[in-house]
Each structure stands twice: as structure tokens, then as C-alpha cells.
Design a protein with these regions (language model features):
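Sec-dependent N-terminal signal peptides
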Residues: 4-14
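Domain-level detector of nuclease and nuclease-like folds
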Residues: 24-130
Length: 130
């Protein structure tokens, strides 16, 4: 009886310990604004400006994407590096290239290429989203 009670008490913990579902599958099916909004409500996606506002990106719906919180942190680190290079005069141009899989509205990766008119790319980083 004690063992049955212990199992009954532990059951919710065991269920809660199940691994998270494969998010890539969810993002592949995130092909509508409603699907993206549902993932954002659950905290699986957060808003990002593809061309960072900090370096002159427009606060415009066409500049918005939805990424994982981890990808947002990576993108912020890239933005910080770009800002430092801009302040040092080492770059004067930024190209942001989001890549999508299928009909998903969530980019699978975002590539940032910062260059200077006098030479090759000074920064070429890819943020993997999913």
C-alpha cells in the first residue's frame, strides 16, 4: 500500500520529467501567423528584428521574425559584435539573410554579413534557430 501511494505521488513528477517534444517539427508546421502566435504564447518563440534596430534596422513588420529564446541571445551577441566593429570603423554595411524551410514562418537560420567598402567581410555569422 505504501508503495502504491509512493508511485501515485511520484507519477506527476515522472510525467513532468518527460523530454520536451521535437521543436523542429513544431516550427516546420508554423506556417501561419496563428501557429506562430501560439508558439510565442507558450514561450517557444520570441520576436526579433532581423536587421537590428541598434544598427539602423526599421521598426517595421517586414523586419520582424520569430525565433527561439536561445537564438535571440545568439543574435544579440552578434549585434553587439557588429556594433563594436561599426564603432571601430571596421564595417560600414550589413546584410542579413534569413533562411526558411518549407512554408514555415520561423527562420531556420539567420546569416549576418558585415563588410566595409574597402575589403572583404569582417564578420560572417550564422545564428541557427532550428
Amino acid at each position: 500500500m505504501i508503495r502504491a501511494l509512493a508511485l501515485a505521488l511520484l507519477a506527476p513528477l515522472l510525467v513532468a520529467a518527460k523530454p520536451a517534444p521535437d521543436l523542429a517539427r513544431d516550427f516546420a508546421r508554423a506556417s501561419t501567423p496563428q501557429a506562430v502566435a501560439a508558439l510565442a504564447e507558450r514561450g517557444q518563440l520570441v520576436k526579433i528584428y532581423l536587421f537590428p534596430l541598434e544598427v539602423g534596422g526599421p521598426e517595421d513588420p517586414m523586419n520582424v521574425a520569430w525565433v527561439t529564446p536561445a537564438a535571440l541571445r545568439q543574435a544579440e551577441a552578434v549585434t553587439d559584435k557588429i556594433i563594436a566593429l561599426l564603432e571601430q570603423g571596421k564595417v560600414d554595411s550589413l546584410d542579413v539573410q534569413p533562411e526558411y524551410k518549407g512554408d514555415s514562418r520561423v527562420p531556420s537560420r539567420i546569416r549576418y554579413i558585415a563588410t566595409h567598402k574597402t575589403g572583404p567581410a569582417k564578420l560572417d555569422r550564422v545564428v541557427e534557430v532550428w
